[in-house]
Amino acid sequence: MAKLLQFNEEALKSILKGVKTLAKAVKVTLGPKGRNVVINKGFGSPLSTKDGVTVAKEVVLKDKFENMGAQLVNQVAAKTSDVAGDGTTTAIVLAEAIYSAGVKNVAAGANPMSLKRGIDQAVETITRSLDHLSTPVNTAQEVRQIATISANNDGEIGRIIGEAMERVGKDGIITVAEAKGIETHVDYVEGMQFDKGYVSPYFITNAEQMSVELSNADILITDKKLSAAKDIIPVLEKIMEKGARPLLIIAEDIDGEALATLVVNKLKAGMTVCAVKAPGFGDRRKAMLQDIAILTGGKVVSEEVGLKLDEVGPEVLGRAKTIKVSKEETTIIDGAGQSNEVKSRLAQIKAELANASTSKYDKEKLEERLAKMVGGVAVVNVGAATETELKEKKARVEDALHATRAAVAQGIVPGGGVALLRAVKSLEKLQLTGDEAIGVTIIKQAAFAPAIAIANNCGKQGNLIAEKIYEATGSYGYDGLTDEFKDLLKAGVIDPVLVTKSALINAASIAGLLLTTAAMITDKPQPKSQPAGMPGMDGMGGMGMGGMGGMGGMGMM
C-alpha cells in the first residue's frame, strides 16, 4: 500500500493543527463555569459530558497527519486519568500551550532536542516545588470540598463521597453503580464479602430472607473439590467431637455425595452447616482463600502445604462472630484472626499495589482484596431521571472519587491554576543557556494556560486574571464560581497535588516528543471504488425492438 510522508516544519504544523482542534473541543469544559460537550456515537442517545478524557477519546480528524497529533495528545488525557483519575482537561491545555510555543521556536531556528532538555528540567523543578506547596488532607470537610469541585461543583456528590470515605476509611473501596431509581444513595458492606452464595437452598436458616445466618461459627477452608462422602465425613466427625458449633465450608466445589452428606446432617441431625464455593480463579483464588484464613484465624487445607482433609481436625478451623450467606454472596463479619498477621497481610498487598509492573487489572483486584481485608466497601448508586443525565452524572461521580483518592494519598494544593503559577517561580533558580533556557521559558508561559482557560470560560479576560494571580502570593487566586479573588485554600477551591503534577508531567512528555518529530508516515487514502453494474448489461444495448423484425415472416399459416 502506498504511503504519504511529511517532513520537518510541514509535519510539525500538521501536528499543531490537530492538537489545537482537540484542545479547542476539550478546553471549553475546564473550570466551574465550563460548558458541556454533546457526543453522538451513532447508537443510543447522545452523551452530554464535561469530562475531558471522554471528549478527547471521541475526537477523530479527517486529515490523517492532523489526526496523528490529536491522538498522541489524547494519550496525555488517558495517562493522566489512569494515574490521578482527574486533571485530563488541564493536561491537554498544558500540552497545547507547550507544543504551540515549541513549534514557534523551532520555526525560528531553535534546536528541538535542546528545547526538550530545557522543558524536562523545568518540569522536574516545578514538580518538586508542587510537593513543597502541598498540604495533607486532615478533615472530612476537605474531602467533601475536593469531591464537590471534581463533580462540577455538585454539593450532593461531594457530600456522598465525603461520607463514604469517612465510613470505609482510606483503605476501603468505593465503587460506582447505576441506581434503579432517580435518587443517588450509598450502600455499605461490613466485613469481608465475596460473590459466592450457598450451593444448596437446604442450608437456609432464615426462610423469610432466603439466607443463611451463622453466629460464632467455625470455618473450614480448602482448595479441594469435595464430591465423595469420604472427602467430608472424617473431618465432620472430628469437628462434631469438639462441639456442635455452626460450620461454614469454603471449597473449590461441593457436589455429589459430599453435598448430600451435608444436607442430610442439616435436615436430620440438626447440624447448622452451610457450604459455598471459593471466590476467584487460579492464583487469585489461592490468594483470596489465604486472605480469609488470616482474617478468621484458620488455615487453608491444601495438599500443596501438606494438609489433607482426612488428616486434619479442629485446629485448622477459622472462626467469625457473624456469617451471612445469600444465594449470590457471602459476608464474614468480625473474624478471629490475629491482628499482627492481618497487618502483615495488608502490608504485603500494599507492596504488590506499589509495584510498577503490576497491571491495571491486577491493581483493581488487589484494591478489592485490600478493602475486603479491612472490611470497608461502599457502593455509590447513581440515580437520574434520564439515561443521558445518568451517564453524565456517573462520570462526574467517578471523577470526584478519583480526585478524592489522589488528594488523600499525596495532599492538596490551591486550585484554579494557582498552584502552577506559584511553583513556576522556582524556575528562576535554573541557570540554563541557549535553547535549553528557551525550553524553560516555554514551560513558564505554559503554566499560565490553565488559569487563562478557566477565566475565559467564566467570561473574563484570561490573560489579565492569570497575571494578577501570578503577582499575588500564597493561596490567593480567582474563584470562577463566585467571580471573586480570595484565599482559595480557605474557600475550598483545591486540587489534589497528584492531579496537577500528573497533568504537567504527561503534557510536557508528549509535547517534547512531538517537537522532536522530523517525519510522519501514514497510509495513502484509497479512492472509493464505484459499485459495479450487472454483468452483461452493456451488451444488451443492441437488443432493440428492431432486432425482432425478422419475426414478421412468422405469420399464421
Curated annotation (Swiss-Prot):
<feature type="binding site">
    <location>
        <position position="416"/>
    </location>
    <ligand>
        <name>ATP</name>
    </ligand>
</feature>
<keyword id="KW-0143">Chaperone</keyword>
<keyword id="KW-0413">Isomerase</keyword>
<dbReference type="GO" id="GO:0005524">
    <property type="term" value="F:ATP binding"/>
</dbReference>
<feature type="binding site">
    <location>
        <begin position="29"/>
        <end position="32"/>
    </location>
    <ligand>
        <name>ATP</name>
    </ligand>
</feature>
<dbReference type="GO" id="GO:0140662">
    <property type="term" value="F:ATP-dependent protein folding chaperone"/>
</dbReference>
<dbReference type="InterPro" id="IPR027413">
    <property type="entry name" value="GROEL-like_equatorial_sf"/>
</dbReference>
<comment type="function">
    <text>Together with its co-chaperonin GroES, plays an essential role in assisting protein folding. The GroEL-GroES system forms a nano-cage that allows encapsulation of the non-native substrate proteins and provides a physical environment optimized to promote and accelerate protein folding.</text>
</comment>
<keyword id="KW-0547">Nucleotide-binding</keyword>
<dbReference type="GO" id="GO:0051082">
    <property type="term" value="F:unfolded protein binding"/>
</dbReference>
<keyword id="KW-0067">ATP-binding</keyword>
<comment type="similarity">
    <text>Belongs to the chaperonin (HSP60) family.</text>
</comment>
<dbReference type="Pfam" id="PF00118">
    <property type="entry name" value="Cpn60_TCP1"/>
</dbReference>
<dbReference type="GO" id="GO:0042026">
    <property type="term" value="P:protein refolding"/>
</dbReference>
<feature type="binding site">
    <location>
        <position position="495"/>
    </location>
    <ligand>
        <name>ATP</name>
    </ligand>
</feature>
<dbReference type="InterPro" id="IPR001844">
    <property type="entry name" value="Cpn60/GroEL"/>
</dbReference>
<feature type="binding site">
    <location>
        <begin position="86"/>
        <end position="90"/>
    </location>
    <ligand>
        <name>ATP</name>
    </ligand>
</feature>
<dbReference type="InterPro" id="IPR027409">
    <property type="entry name" value="GroEL-like_apical_dom_sf"/>
</dbReference>
<dbReference type="InterPro" id="IPR027410">
    <property type="entry name" value="TCP-1-like_intermed_sf"/>
</dbReference>
<dbReference type="GO" id="GO:0016853">
    <property type="term" value="F:isomerase activity"/>
</dbReference>
<feature type="binding site">
    <location>
        <position position="50"/>
    </location>
    <ligand>
        <name>ATP</name>
    </ligand>
</feature>
<keyword id="KW-0963">Cytoplasm</keyword>
<dbReference type="GO" id="GO:0005737">
    <property type="term" value="C:cytoplasm"/>
</dbReference>
<protein>
    <recommendedName>
        <fullName>Chaperonin GroEL 1</fullName>
        <ecNumber>5.6.1.7</ecNumber>
    </recommendedName>
</protein>
<comment type="subunit">
    <text>Forms a cylinder of 14 subunits composed of two heptameric rings stacked back-to-back. Interacts with the co-chaperonin GroES.</text>
</comment>
<dbReference type="InterPro" id="IPR002423">
    <property type="entry name" value="Cpn60/GroEL/TCP-1"/>
</dbReference>
